[in-house]
Design a protein with these regions (language model features):
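Flavin-dependent oxidoreductase catalytic cores
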Residues: 1-382, 386, 391-397, 401-402, ...
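Conserved acidic residues
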Residues: 55, 159, 246, 308, ...
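Flanking helices and flexible, charged tails adjoining ferredoxin-like Fe-S electron-transfer domains
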Residues: 201, 365-374, 397, 401, ...
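Short beta-alpha connecting loops at secondary-structure transitions
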Residues: 258-264, 285, 308, 415-423, ...
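A short helix-to-beta-strand connector/capping loop
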Residues: 306, 438-445, 479-483, 552-554, ...
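Rossmann-like dinucleotide/flavin-binding elements
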Residues: 377-407, 446-454, 458, 466-475, ...
Length: 673
């Protein structure tokens, strides 16, 4: 064991069983849970993380009955047949040396089907169905269903269960005055509102006996109006412990909350102090979670606070060998999760199978295999952006001899720009990872080298990952000195105090955030909490207060040609954060805009097909974020020389900057070579 992380890598004795370290792979729905035919893929997915050293794995959520389904016919643990099927998962994890819990999750009013139930018949703002009020008899049946699901999990070979009581699902709905308007034994007083989850834990313990882990995932800060008070939260923790819980896991925010808790702009370890405060009131281990992604931070948390375990879900998607690398003194080789959500949670919330932007093998362990090549080939990769880096590293990992050409002085491509956006500083970790891997696998990196046909002749395979160039729209005055590309704006060009941003896609939102922010709140937890109104839960019910955003550094206009709301194509789980942030920073968003001309006075615009309401935006600068064009100027020359290049990333498709697609294409190509 390395001395760098002595607490993180130390075992935890639970009395009847021992966890090999303090690392928990937190629950995340992958989409593989919902179909019986995907059970082998799910087993392989978990087994790879167990082989990578994770101490305790928690599955995605399984409903204890049909009203608890997230979707019709979604994942469930209600029958002996379900339990038998899950033996493949538990056997695979145990053979790899790990332990695994089944999460039991009742969606309540978050269910996407007309049979949903809740504490009261109050519709969720994020689902189309109004739930039916669960009757007193229905409450009792649901408690028994949780206990039955836990018994089935034991039959399936699970080491325990996690009872999902946070994130606004059914148990949380009973706990909060916001959603529980009952006046019977299951509502009214705080004690009655707690009765439902506490009774679930008690009856579950009776059903499974003493030698079985029961982890209760509790909401430690709801971040919604009329959420739980601190006294209620502490009382729940102590009562859940008394009812038989082994572990207490941390949850923060409901899915409808307007305080972000998981996106990359949330400061690292933002909620650890809350988990530690709860831990002071209980005698069972408390698990810290949310925005913890590197072993140095995890070790510090365990050393400085009262928590005893660290839960990380997305970091284990990004790098299944996270624990092994930390234990071997190779933390610099960890493919650090950047909390982008683009291939994981954004997929989950539109009911697609989950993967990882940085690791497209996640969830595809049985189909996307990077095994040793039978015949090493000389491979040239042109372009060191995300696509080229993934292709180069993956090909070299398989045993190919790889040369990487990059016209610029550094690797990273669009990630080198993205890391400068407030809230995206961690994108630099991806560049660090690839820099390390290029060296580890012996890739010959040629910076400041614009490869031509002559340089590429003689390679067995040539990969064009030459990326994109900003598209220049046809606007009179586009050559005016006050006009900047988004790359120039982000890279340090002098910019005035009033700016128009042309193009309201993802790049336009990022550039606007860059322009209105002097210092990133992601790097200052106090400022971030003030901006979002995230209160100390010990001082405010629901952990909410009035947001106090920092004053914008500049006056910014964000413009788009199309009508309608801006940012509709942003990520499902992060788009609302970007929109809310720009609104708080007083960015003026204008849609249906015609760009008439740019001159010394500023940007002249009008609106609609009839070019109505002409006006002048008297701005100091105009930043162009109007899309990209593929850079493929090498292709024709290569083909003329008899070389058929592989084209990936932005060089293949430039409609949107899409690192998810780029890294996936690079990895898949390397697997085929």
């Amino acid at each position: 064991m390395t001395s760098e992380y002595p607490t993180l890598l130390s075992p935890l004795d639970l009395g009847f069983t021992t966890l090999r370290n303090r690392v928990v792979m937190g629950s995340m729905h992958t989409g593989l849970e919902d179909r019986a035919g995907d059970i082998n893929a799910l087993a392989a997915y978990f087994a790879e993380r167990a082989r990578g050293g994770v101490g305790l794995i928690i599955t995605g959520g399984y409903a204890p009955n049909r009203t608890g389904w997230l979707l019709p016919f979604a994942s469930q643990m209600i029958s002996a047949a379900d339990a038998r099927r899950h033996r493949r998962i538990t056997d695979a994890v145990h053979e790899a040396g790990g332990k695994i819990l089944l999460q039991i999750l009742h969606a309540g009013r978050y269910a996407y089907h007309p049979f949903s139930v809740s504490a009261s018949a109050i519709k969720s703002p994020i689902t189309p169905f109004r739930p039916r009020r669960l009757s007193a008899r229905g409450v009792e049946r649901t408690i028994d269903d949780f206990a039955h699901a836990a018994s089935l999990a034991a039959e399936a070979g699970y080491d325990g269960v996690e009872i999902m009581g946070s994130e606004g699902y059914l148990l949380n709905q009973f706990l909060a005055p916001r959603t529980n308007k009952r006046r019977d034994a299951w509502g009214g007083s705080a004690a009655n509102r707690r009765r439902f989850p506490v009774e679930i834990v008690r009856r579950t313990r009776e059903a499974v006996g003493d030698d079985f882990i029961i982890c209760y995932r509790m909401s430690m800060a709801d971040y919604v109006p009329d959420g739980q008070s601190w006294d209620e939260t502490v009382a729940l923790a102590t009562e859940v412990e008394a009812a038989g819980a082994t572990l207490l896991n941390s949850g923060f925010g409901w899915h409808e909350a307007r305080v972000p808790t998981i996106v990359t702009s949330v400061p690292n370890s933002a909620f650890v102090d809350i988990s530690s405060a709860v831990a002071e009131h209980v005698g069972i281990p408390v698990v810290a979670s949310n925005r913890i992604n590197m072993p140095q931070a995890a070790e510090q948390i365990l050393a400085d606070t009262q928590v005893q375990l660290i839960s990380m879900a997305r970091p284990m998607l990004a790098d299944p060998d996270w624990v092994a690398k930390a234990a071997d003194g190779r933390a610099h080789e960890i493919n650090t999760c950047i909390s982008c959500n683009q291939a994981c949670l954004d997929h989950a919330f539109v009911h697609k199978k989950v993967s990882c932007l940085l690791n497209p093998r996640a969830g595809r362990e049985t189909t996307l295999v990077l095994g040793p090549t039978r015949r090493a080939r000389n491979v040239a990769v042109v372009g060191a952006g995300p696509a080229g880096l993934s292709a180069a590293v993956s090909a070299a990992q398989r045993g190919h001899v790889v040369t990487l050409f990059e016209a610029g002085p550094v690797i990273g491509g669009q990630f080198d720009l993205a890391k400068r956006i407030p809230g995206k500083e961690e994108f630099a970790e991806t560049i660090r990872y690839y820099t390390t891997m290029l060296d580890k696998y012996g890739v010959s990196v040629r910076l400041n080298t614009r490869a031509g046909v002559a340089e590429l002749t003689g390679f067995d395979e040539v990969v064009l990952a030459t990326g994109v160039a900003p598209r220049i729209p046809d606007i009179p005055g586009i050559e005016h000195p006050k006009v900047l590309s988004y790359a120039q704006a982000i890279s340090g060009a002098p910019i005035g105090k009033s700016v128009a941003v042309i193009g309201a896609g993802g790049v336009g939102f990022d550039v606007s955030e860059f322009l209105v922010t002097d210092a990133s709140p992601t790097l200052n937890l106090k400022e971030w909490k003030a901006e979002w109104g995230a209160a100390d839960p010990q001082e405010a019910r629901g952990a909410l207060t009035t947001p106090i955003p920092a004053e914008p550094a500049r006056e910014v206009y964000l413009l788009q040609r199309s009508k309608g709301r801006q940012g509709t194509r942003l990520g499902k789980t992060s788009g609302w954060v970007h929109r809310a942030s720009l609104k708080a920073k007083k960015v003026q968003q204008l849609s249906g805009v015609n760009y008439e001309r740019i001159d010394d006075a500023g940007l002249h615009i009008s609106f609609g097909p009839d070019r109505k309401r002409p006006q002048l935006l008297a701005v100091d600068n105009v930043v162009i974020c109007a899309g990209q064009e593929s850079v493929r100027d090498l292709e024709d020359g290569l083909r003329a020389a008899g070389i058929r290049p592989h084209i990936i990333g932005g060089a293949a498709v430039a409609a949107e900057l899409d690192a998810k697609r780029a890294i996936k294409q690079g990895t898949e190509l390397a697997a085929r070579l």
